[in-house]
């Protein structure tokens, strides 16, 4: 497919990129809203269905380095939708999840969500390159081919997300 955008308001967006499936990258910009979070989780369910259909595993990378802390109701929604995704089998089809985060507040939110969801295999990293490198290694260990054309050193955020930051 390619890049899909979830826009909540003028100040938040999520770029959802499956160009290199089974490696998927979501770039969060601003404070997520209910609308953008629901669109993101709908996309994750689609990626899970695709992985099941293709009998493969996927690497889920979330670039939260441009994100702002979500409101409490949005954090609750993220927790609820994460549970729904786990119940749909994400823990069996996602090799690993990597979150690029440098904001201590965002890291705290993610850590709290991790405590609520013990089955989540989430690794926090400093850069997208690091997440992509680790993800490709994980695919290799799972004996799954790396997506053609994905070079972690050359990967860039979508232009619209770069402009918004």
Annotate each predicted stretch with a short phrase.
Residues 1-165:
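Amphipathic, Lys/Arg-enriched alpha-helical "gate/interface" segment within cytosolic domains
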């Amino acid at each position: 497919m390619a890049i899909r955008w979830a826009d909540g308001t003028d100040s938040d967006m999520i770029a959802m990129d499956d160009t290199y499936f089974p490696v998927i990258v979501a770039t969060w910009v601003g404070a997520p809203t209910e609308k953008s979070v629901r669109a993101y989780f709908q996309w994750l369910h689609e990626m899970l269905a695709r992985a099941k259909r293709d009998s493969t595993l996927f690497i889920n990378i979330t670039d939260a380095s441009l994100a702002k802390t979500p409101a409490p109701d949005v954090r609750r929604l993220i927790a609820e939708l994460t549970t729904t995704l786990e119940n749909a089998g994400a823990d069996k089809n996602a090799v690993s999840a990597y979150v690029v985060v440098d904001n201590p507040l965002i890291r705290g939110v993610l850590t709290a969500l991790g405590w609520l969801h013990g089955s989540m295999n989430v690794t926090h990293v400093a850069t997208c390159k690091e997440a992509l490198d680790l993800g490709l290694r994980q695919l290799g260990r799972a004996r799954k081919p790396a997506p053609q054309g994905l070079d972690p050193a050359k990967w860039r955020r979508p232009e619209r997300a770069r402009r918004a930051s």
